[in-house]
Amino acid sequence: MNPVPAQREYFLDSIRAWLMLLGIPFHISLIYSSHTWHVNSAEPSLWLTLFNDFIHSFRMLVFFVISGYFSYMLFLRYPLKKWWKVRVERVGIPMLTAIPLLTLPQFIMLQYVKGKAESWPGLSLYDKYNTLAWELISHLWFLLVLVVMTTLCVWIFKRIRNNLENSDKTNKKFSMVKLSVIFLCLGIGYAVIRRTIFIVYPPILSNGMFNFIVMQTLFYLPFFILGALAFIFPHLKALFTTPSRGCTLAAALAFVAYLLNQRYGSGDAWMYETESVITMVLGLWMVNVVFSFGHRLLNFQSARVTYFVNASLFIYLVHHPLTLFFGAYITPHITSNWLGFLCGLIFVVGIAIILYEIHLRIPLLKFLFSGKPVVKRENDKAPAR
């Protein structure tokens, strides 16, 4: 069994927080990109589209690696049932809280913004269910996926731990070439599964819950397990934290391929399958790029960084409806895309931080948006003198 590191992994905490916060410029730039979203500017911006594609190509892949790393660390700290309970509470409670408080009002707002409120009663029962699945889960999808992954990893992590007890992990060697081949095969395997589903029963791919619970989990699970393995094997972790020109160059070429597929691919052909293969290896190489960069520049303790590490989940949860509100009611009055983008950042981040500070002063909200019980200090229990 692995000992839990005594020293805090500051750079991983920081990377995870900044990847979460990157969701803000990602969604604001989506308004000004050429991609169709709930709300869009009158004219798309080429550079903001490129910026949006860059963030989207790797952000959640690296995020799930870090999630797997910390998840296995906690797996060794707690008994199995307590580990599952703690992990599910910390992601499940904020998700269930955000649905009635954030994504439901967001859905109602969009119904009127997009002029769909009047047609809602005419939808079939299934269409209403599926629309609500997509719209209420919305940007919370990764929390649902983490709940599913945690449940699956009750068995997977047990198998990994049992195998480690019967093998010598010090002799386990990894190389980026071998990992690249493995992830290329995983990408091809995922593409085959998706294409098979598309041929056999294509409507299921547009089902929101199937997409989140099955397809997204299936795609991101290898990165989650990779994070756990990086915690177990120091050599693998060192492979990611050591700068590699080869990974940087390969990631750049893969991103170009990603853009070409976005530009010339067709959803009715092989665009989504090709994207899964490209992003699977791109995500692996970007783990090295991001980890090595973060290890060099972010591996320190800072009160300011700690503040945003603690605030990142709450800010991410509330930013999405704020972004859509900005896009629906403020964007049409700003003619410059770049000015609108900057104003959007100030608007969303500013209000999100204010809401974060307010929620810290309300114990119930603090618990609901973190999933962590409020611990009273001993001196709070002491009688006044």
Curated annotation (Swiss-Prot):
4Fe-4S is among the record's keywords: no
Matches recorded under NCBIfam families: PRK03854.1
InterPro entries (alphabetical): Acyl_transf_3_dom (IPR002656), Glucan_succinyl_AcylTrfase (IPR050623), Glucans_biosynth_C (IPR023723)
Enzyme class: transferase
Membrane association type: Multi-pass membrane protein
Record carries keyword Transport: no
Gene name linked to the record: mdoC
Entry's Gene Ontology BP terms: glucan biosynthetic process
Family: Belongs to the acyltransferase 3 family. OpgC subfamily.
Enzyme Commission number(s) from the entry: 2.1.-.-
Protein's cellular compartments: Cell membrane
Summary of the function given for this chain in its UniProt record: Necessary for the succinyl substitution of periplasmic glucans. Could catalyze the transfer of succinyl residues from the cytoplasmic side of the membrane to the nascent glucan backbones on the periplasmic side of the membrane.
Official protein name in the record: Glucans biosynthesis protein C
Superkingdom classification of source: Bacteria
